[in-house]
Structure formats: C-alpha cells, structure tokens
Amino acid sequence: MLPHVVLTFRRLGCALASCRLAPARHRGSGLLHTAPVARSDRSAPVFTRALAFGDRIALVDQHGRHTYRELYSRSLRLSQEICRLCGCVGGDLREERVSFLCANDASYVVAQWASWMSGGVAVPLYRKHPAAQLEYVICDSQSSVVLASQEYLELLSPVVRKLGVPLLPLTPAIYTGAVEEPAEVPVPEQGWRNKGAMIIYTSGTTGRPKGVLSTHQNIRAVVTGLVHKWAWTKDDVILHVLPLHHVHGVVNALLCPLWVGATCVMMPEFSPQQVWEKFLSSETPRINVFMAVPTIYTKLMEYYDRHFTQPHAQDFLRAVCEEKIRLMVSGSAALPLPVLEKWKNITGHTLLERYGMTEIGMALSGPLTTAVRLPGSVGTPLPGVQVRIVSENPQREACSYTIHAEGDERGTKVTPGFEEKEGELLVRGPSVFREYWNKPEETKSAFTLDGWFKTGDTVVFKDGQYWIRGRTSVDIIKTGGYKVSALEVEWHLLAHPSITDVAVIGVPDMTWGQRVTAVVTLREGHSLSHRELKEWARNVLAPYAVPSELVLVEEIPRNQMGKIDKKALIRHFHPS
C-alpha cells in the first residue's frame, strides 16, 4: 500500500476513534445574501440563485476554494467582455452561441454562467477531442466567440483562425480575481423559459454529431426533478470526476449541487488513488455524494484489489463509506451486475441506477431508499416526466404505435395483455429538448406524430420498475459512459488510405460496457496493424471512439440491399 494512503488511514483512525463516524456537519457559511434577480421567472438559470448563497463554498479545485459570490462576480465580468467583443445590444446576445474549452475547474462554471448572463447559448467543448472535432462543433454551432483557458490556446488558435471566429482567452483572474460588489440587478430581466441555454453534441444513427439544443426551462426541469428525487441540500458535497460535455457531468453532478448551494469538489482528471483518498479524508469539505460511469467504478475496484489488501483497512474503508457517503450513483451505461455486487461488498453501497440521454436529460431513477432498489432496474419516472412503452402499429391512423404501458411519477398503468412486454421507450415533458441545431427534419423525425420523443431504447416494465434492454439501433455504442456513433467512426476510417470497407460494432465488455471494434477490408497489397490504426485514428476521433479491436476480413457480408447485418457480425466474431 502506498505510504500516504497508510498515513491517511492513521489520521482517519484517530478521527474514527474520536467521532465514532458521526455524520459530518457542513462548515459554517456566515450570512447569506440575496439579490432580486429574475424573481418572476421560474425558468431562470442557476447563476440567478448564486448571490443567495453568498460566501458559501461552491467549488473546490486545484486552484483553491471559490465562493458563490466569487463565481458570480467573475462570471459577470466575463459576460461583459463577451458582450463588448460581440457588440451585443442591451447586454443580450439573443441566443448567439458561445463555445468554450476549459479545464474541470472553476473556469468551466465561470464560462458557462458568463455565456448565460450575456444571453448566449453555452456550447461546451471537450478537451480530449482532436482539433478536427472541435472545429466541427464550433463551425456547426455557428459560434460567435470561443472562450479558452490558457492551456488550450495553442490547440484552439489555428482552429478559430481558420474559421474566422474571435478567441477570448481566460486569464488567471478567472480563479483569483478581486470580487466586485455586483449591481442590485446585474443582468437584464428576460424571459428565460424558452430561451436557448446549451447545445451538447451527441452521436446519432445518422453519423456526424448532432447539436442538442436545450432551453433554460429544459435544464431547470431536469435539475429540480433530480434535486427532489435525490434529496439534494446545501449540506451536500459531491466529488466530481466526470467530463463536462455531456448531461451526466454538466447537469447531474454540477448544476444540481450549485442549484441548492452545495459544494462541488472538482478533480482535473480521474485518478482512482485520489478518489479513494477523497472518500477517506477527514478534511472538510467532506465528500458525501459521488456519481460515475460503470467503467470508473471498475477502475476504482481494480485499485482497491491492489492496494487495500489488509482486512482492517477494508473494514475501515467500508465503515467510512457507509457512514459518511449518503449517495452513490451510476449512469451513462448499463451497470453490470458483478460490478454492482462487488461495489456493495466493498463500500456497503448499492449503486443507484438512473436513465437519461442528452435529448431528455434524466427520465427515470431508482429510489433514494437503498432497501427497495432492484439491481439492473432504472426505477420510475422523475417529477414532470411522462413515459410510454410502445411497439409499432402502422395500421393505426391516429398514431402509429400500440401502448404497452404508460406512467409518470405517480405510477404506471399497463395495457391488459402487454404485461412485461418489451417495447421502445417514449418520453414527454418539460425536460425534453427544443431541437437538433439546424436540423429541422431530424428534429421532426425524432418525435411521434403526437409529440413524444423516441429514445431508441428497448425497455420493459416489471416488478413496478423500468428495465433497459438495450439500444434499438446497433449503430450506437456505449463505451465507458460515452455514446459513440458507429457510423461516424466508419466515416472517418474510410478515409484511411489502406481501408476499402469497414463495419464498426459494439462488442460486450465487462469493463467498458461495450468496446469499439472495427471489422475492416484492406486494399490489395496493403497491411494494417491495430497499433497503426490507433495512431492514425487518434488524429480524427475522440479517444473513447478509437477502435480498441481490429478484425481484418477479405469481405464484409451484406444483404441484398447492400446493408450490413451488424448483429450477425457480433454473433460471428464474438459468439460468447
């Protein structure tokens, strides 16, 4: 075991003896301050609540501690710079897009809030995406300005220069700038409800990523639903280890705590060692909420197996986790039962499973009460969410489907004769997105004629809860909590000079959920190793989309219509 981990045990051992693991109290917050910002608008974004939490600690990162007042003041200052640069009238960008690339720290929150304060739509970029993918998002979103932390200026400068988009560097004042007393009403009162708030890019069955545009009402609906369901309070402290370009990291793990005045401890990179140290540390603020994808839990357990080998250390770890941490959540990918069971043995926690996607935020969640959680189930609808399980029925005129079950937070009604019958999940409610950016036809086709969003996921209702059976489309691969479009990967791989044909499939994997596998046909006389393919693909694909397996074949089988039967490919190459 590492020396400093042992030291942590010794220090916590003393704490254990003295406090007997009494639940930690939140540090004193002093006087709370309020400001009359957008009181009349029930869809106002999270920053309008910040001054009410005043000098409470909002974030802890590698730069230090940041209060709500500090984040607000720095965001306001940055929003004014954005408006000056863009020449917006009356301090309102009127939904112009603001792309930003920041580290997992306070700079991200400041950039997000500043985008909203200036009346813009926030477009978060992912720091591990290659330049070509960043260029695609900035171009497709038609961003008016790009914000970037100092460490990403070199990466983004040639991209924005090529696109002709102004670049606004974020200075160190983002972290340490003096706090100015904000005006009584610092941002223009505006109708937030239907105003565009954020575009998150998600992979789809059509290939290139689509921009999912959510309104402030959409985001508020997700946040308030989760705050209610998971009993968030100002005394919570969450450890944040997730990427900040999808709903799990942005909404669930960041906006929820900031909504209630809680504290978010942000790690710049996921590190199993540092996560365990944070769990076991007696320093304040003390972690009591954690959210991750199944792959992260697997990595944590692998570290545990290597370093927590002594029975007394294992007992101590379990005692601390049981007494100090109130909620642990898994999402973004199916949670393998062995992972759930082993995590419970290690920490005493039965992971709460939930279901959502970029277009709908969160729709289903397991119960907060651990005793009634069913392993493998994603629970029941969140407040405000309506769901249906349906199957196609083209003979019906009013709507082209048959309803198996329909429910909301109050309960689910099953159609007689359709008990425990699988079907596609449809979702409706205030959390459902406004549109795919600049894609009206794809937006239209994503909904039924009567206005329900088609998730493309196969589900079943049984034992009083909902169970996800998998994607209706084999062209969506969920790996390590990320959603990868097989078609987009194929599109890029076909540009390789040695490849003539390719099929990308998702193969079941205990660690990653699915792994990206490329079935490839090469040009005559060419050769290609997996290592060579990975090195080439890293220049055009996100790290998680680079194929982790290469299968070379003389010909990829297709049907009479020229289509590839990917389910048959998976069965052929991976029969287990």
UniProtKB/Swiss-Prot annotation:
Top-level taxonomic group: Eukaryota
Subcellular location: Mitochondrion
Pfam families per the UniProt record, alphabetical: AMP-binding, AMP-binding_C
Entry EC no(s): 6.2.1.76
Alphabetically ordered keywords of this record: ATP-binding, Fatty acid metabolism, Ligase, Lipid metabolism, Mitochondrion, Nucleotide-binding, Transit peptide
Residues noted as binding ATP in the record, renumbered to the chain: T202, S203, G204, T205, T206, G207, R208, P209, K210, D457, R471, K563
Transit peptide feature, positions: 1-83
GO cellular component, one term: mitochondrion
Family annotation (PROSITE patterns): AMP_BINDING
Main location: mitochondrion
BP term (GO), one: long-chain fatty-acyl-CoA biosynthetic process
Molecular function as annotated in GO: acid-thiol ligase activity; ATP binding; CoA-ligase activity; malonyl-CoA synthetase activity; very long-chain fatty acid-CoA ligase activity
Disease: Combined malonic and methylmalonic aciduria: A metabolic disease characterized by malonic and methylmalonic aciduria, with urinary excretion of much larger amounts of methylmalonic acid than malonic acid, in the presence of normal malonyl-CoA decarboxylase activity. Clinical features include coma, ketoacidosis, hypoglycemia, failure to thrive, microcephaly, dystonia, axial hypotonia and/or developmental delay, and neurologic manifestations including seizures, psychiatric disease and/or cognitive decline.
Function according to Swiss-Prot or TrEMBL: Catalyzes the initial reaction in intramitochondrial fatty acid synthesis, by activating malonate and methylmalonate, but not acetate, into their respective CoA thioester. May have some preference toward very-long-chain substrates.
Record-stated family: Belongs to the ATP-dependent AMP-binding enzyme family.
Protein name in UniProt: Malonate--CoA ligase ACSF3, mitochondrial
